[in-house]
Every structure is written in structure tokens, then in C-alpha cells.
């Protein structure tokens, strides 16, 4: 479909949904998501340090930002509406990405959005890119370093925002021997178990959150703006 719409020799495309991490290679498009025991380990670790989901021999298009979409030439983002069977996770389409084409197959509609910031296969860079050393647990700092090195600038593309308040409901913690903190329900007979964080940010900015762990488990995140939070008039929005 997209090869007919855009016959350019190289660009990447990704999807807001995943059936498996091998969707790109299985359906014939170039993406970030992939799993293989023969994959290049340094390349996987680089993607992991830039915020992408990672699991030993796979990487997945979860944890993306405007910066990484631009850097890795994610020119199109595919969304699926209607029949969402076999859809495991979902990434939100940024407002800046504009609908370019779509097609319907059965009761499912596939929509393709163009990323106006995709940088292409290659770009001119400052020599300092060769000196960048990525840290283990801060993808936002890493992205700041990469783009400042590419452009020869000293900007803060991502800035850390403080947590104003946090509350735990039915949550206990324990320290593991490797320094990690384990979170678990205090009372397993109670279904509700969560942590609330209150943060303050610019209303027209995007909020990103990174939860590093060596012990991969499912984790649901909901968000709510201040007005709805204070009066309880609207339910929280599921973020992933």
C-alpha cells in the first residue's frame, strides 16, 4: 500500500499497535520493531538507551519521542481503527503528524500519518557526534546529547519536571539485592493498587515518562489534567 503511495527507496514506517514485534518484517515494511537471536547487540542497546522497549533479543516501537522518530526516519505512522483484534499495545498519533492516505480491509481501517520531521537516511553532522557516550538509565538525557552533538548546540530539548506530590494506595515496597525497588500489593484481596504522581508542566508541552527495570512486568499508566483531577468530573485517560 505505502510503496505505491510513496515509492521512495528508503524510509521507515511504524505502527501505533502491535500484534508481534516482527510486524514490520512480516508485512513488508522497514521499522524499528524486530526480534531475532542474530540481531546486532550494540544496535539493540543503543535503541534501548534512547528509550525504546527492549528485551534481550528484541526491540519494539514503544517509548518513542518526536526526537527518535526524526532521528530514525520514521516517515509514516500507521494507525488502525474499527476492528482492533490482535492489537496488544497502542501509541498515540501526535497532532503534528497529518493523515496522508488510508485504506479499508473488512471492518478495519488503516490510516497513515506523515511525520514532517523525519530526517532521512543520512544527514550532515557536527564531528562531536563521535564522542557521545550514552548513559544506562536516562533516555531523555541521551537524546539531548545526541541532538546537541548532531546540531552543534547546547539546548535542553527535554527538561526534567519535579513530582509535586505522590501517594500510594495498597502498595508496599522492598529493596532487592541489586538495588532495584520491588512494588507489590499490600493486600492481594483488594483489586485497587496504584501510585499517584502530581506534576506541573506547560499545558502545550508533551509529557514523557520512563520506568527502567530489569524485571519486565505489565504496568498501566493513566493521566488526567488538573481541572478534571480536582473536581473528578472526567475519568482518567489510559496512556498505555
Describe the residue ranges of each PLM region.
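Soluble catalytic regions of membrane-associated enzymes that act on cell-envelope
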Residues: 1-239
Amino acid at each position: 500500500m505505502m510503496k505505491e503511495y510513496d515509492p521512495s527507496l528508503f524510509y521507515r514506517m511504524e505502527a501505533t499497535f502491535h500484534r508481534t514485534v516482527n510486524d514490520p518484517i512480516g508485512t513488508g515494511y522497514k521499522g524499528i520493531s524486530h526480534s531475532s537471536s542474530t540481531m546486532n547487540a550494540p544496535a539493540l542497546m543503543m535503541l534501548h538507551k534512547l528509550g525504546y522497549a527492549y528485551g534481550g533479543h528484541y526491540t519494539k516501537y514503544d517509548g518513542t519521542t518526536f526526537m527518535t522518530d526524526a532521528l530514525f526516519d520514521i516517515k509514516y505512522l500507521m494507525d488502525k481503527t474499527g476492528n482492533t483484534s490482535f492489537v496488544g499495545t497502542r501509541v498515540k498519533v501526535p497532532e503534528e503528524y497529518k493523515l496522508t492516505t488510508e485504506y479499508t480491509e473488512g471492518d478495519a481501517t488503516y490510516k497513515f500519518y506523515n511525520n514532517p520531521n523525519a530526517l532521512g537516511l543520512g544527514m550532515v553532522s557536527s564531528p562531536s557526534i563521535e564522542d557521545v557516550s550514552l548513559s544506562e538509565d536516562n533516555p531523555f538525557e541521551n537524546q539531548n546529547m545526541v541532538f546537541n552533538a548532531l546540531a552543534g548546540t547546547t539546548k535542553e530539548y527535554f527538561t526534567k519536571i519535579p513530582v509535586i506530590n505522590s501517594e500510594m494506595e495498597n502498595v508496599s515496597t522492598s529493596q532487592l539485592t541489586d538495588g532495584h525497588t520491588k512494588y507489590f500489593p499490600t493486600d492481594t484481596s483488594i483489586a485497587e493498587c496504584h501510585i499517584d504522581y502530581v506534576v506541573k508542566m506547560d499545558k502545550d508541552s508533551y509529557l514523557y515518562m520512563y520506568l527502567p527495570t530489569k524485571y519486565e512486568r505489565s504496568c498501566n499508566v493513566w493521566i488526567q489534567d488538573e481541572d478534571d483531577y480536582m473536581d473528578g468530573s472526567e475519568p482518567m485517560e489510559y496512556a498505555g
